[in-house]
Swiss-Prot record:
Monomer. The gene is HMT-2. InterPro entries: Betaine-hCys_S-MeTrfase_BHMT (IPR017226), HCY_dom (IPR003726), HCY_dom_sf (IPR036589), Hcy_S-methyltransferase (IPR051486). In contrast to HMT-1, it is not inhibited by methionine. This is Homocysteine S-methyltransferase 2. Expressed predominantly in roots. Expressed in rosette leaves, cauline leaves and developing seeds. Catalyzes methyl transfer from S-methylmethionine (SMM) to adenosyl-L-homocysteine (AdoMet). SMM degradation (by HMT-1, HMT-2 and HMT-3) and biosynthesis (by MMT1) constitute the SMM cycle in plants, which is probably required to achieve short term control of AdoMet level. Its cofactor is Zn(2+). It comes from the Eukaryota. Its EC number is 2.1.1.10. Pfam families: S-methyl_trans (PF02574).
Length: 333
């Protein structure tokens, strides 16, 4: 698939045998390759300093079996780039660049696909691949940990959130992405802002909504997961809903709650379960699960109703390859 030809996640899933693989962590993978992301722009810093690295990591995930790759724009905002001294035009260009790099990686992957389906454990199979333009929350822009609390203060209203995100969404939607991945949504008000912006008409492509939880019951702000999902359910342009950046042990219970209030495909891409120290801005070692334990959950998630699976922070192409292998016998291809 190429930009703007995608409309229905259900149709896409028919082409992928009922299940699809989402890529894994980007920022933590950049760091694993040696990138220094100690910056308010976080992974978006690589759009300026090392676009070749972004291309490489996208390609690694495609060769691991990912059917959907997300652009390196989670923490990329016009306001964030302007705070670093970039002009409005340069800031918008960097947003577009995030999607262009992902689409170029998809093209590079297709070029590598020959008659062989694998090589050196690489999955080289021409198949429908979606490019999702990643959009993080207002809290991600603040880079103060509020994306993990959802607490923005009384001064942040629905209209202010819409004004903050509006132009960013327009630029990303016009950059050739197939859909927008609204990720790590921490509260109900921001979900409503995203739904309103999708319905305003300036954003011509659909999106998915993915929330995060720290207790396995509610989203991180304490808002009801079912109320948050209901906002997405009532927005026609939302084509899938689910959970990301949440420990694997919480996923099954959350999915069972989500399934009660949605008819849309359900996606999950948890983190490794490791704890993140927001004050020190680093991951706490030995607090998560390894790939083998992570992938052991996959069957339960599918049985609970999940059809799109991947990974978030601290997951790698190795994780995604293992998920791909788990799906082989479940797919109706």
């Amino acid at each position: 698939m190429t930009g703007n030809s995608f409309n229905s996640m259900k149709d896409f899933l028919k082409q992928t045998g009922g299940y699809a693989v989402i890529d894994g962590g980007l920022a933590t993978e950049f760091e694993r390759h040696g990138a220094d992301l100690n910056d308010p722009l976080w992974s978006a810093k690589c759009l300026v300093t090392s676009p070749h690295l972004i291309h490489t990591v996208h390609l690694d995930y495609l060769e691991a079996g990912a059917d959907i790759i997300s652009s390196a724009s989670y923490q990329a905002t016009i306001q964030g780039f302007e705070a670093k001294g970039f002009s409005r035009e340069e800031s918008e260009s960097l947003l577009k660049k995030s999607v262009e790099i992902a689409t170029e990686a998809r093209n590079s992957y297709y070029d590598k696909c020959g008659t062989s389906s694998s090589m050196d454990d690489k999955i080289l199979k021409k198949r429908p691949i979606l490019v999702a333009a990643s959009v993080g929350s207002y809290g991600a822009y603040l880079a103060d940990g509020s994306e993990y609390s959802g607490i923005y203060g009384d001064s942040i209203t629905l209209e202010k959130l819409k004004d903050f995100h509006r132009r960013r969404l327009q630029v990303l939607a016009e950059s050739g992405a197939d859909l927008i991945a609204f990720e790590t949504i921490p509260n109900k008000i921001e979900a409503q802002a995203f739904a309103d912006l999708l319905e305003e008409g300036d954003v011509k492509i659909p999106g998915w909504f993915s929330f995060n939880s720290k207790d396995g019951v509610n989203v991180v702000s304490g808002d009801s997961i079912k109320e948050c999902i209901s906002i997405a359910e009532n927005c026609e342009k939302v084509v899938a809903v689910g959970i990301n950046c949440t420990p694997p042990r919480f996923i099954e219970g959350l999915v069972l709650e989500i399934e009660k209030v949605t008819s849309k495909p359900i996606l999950v891409y948890p983190n490794s379960g490791e704890s993140y120290d927001a004050d020190r801005k680093e991951w706490v070692e030995n607090t998560g699960v390894g790939d083998e334990d992570f992938v052991s959950y996959v069957e339960k998630w599918m049985d609970a109703g999940v059809s799109l699976l991947g990974g978030c922070c601290r997951t790698t192409p190795t994780t995604i390859r293992a998920i791909h292998k788990r799906l082989v016998n479940r797919r109706s291809l």
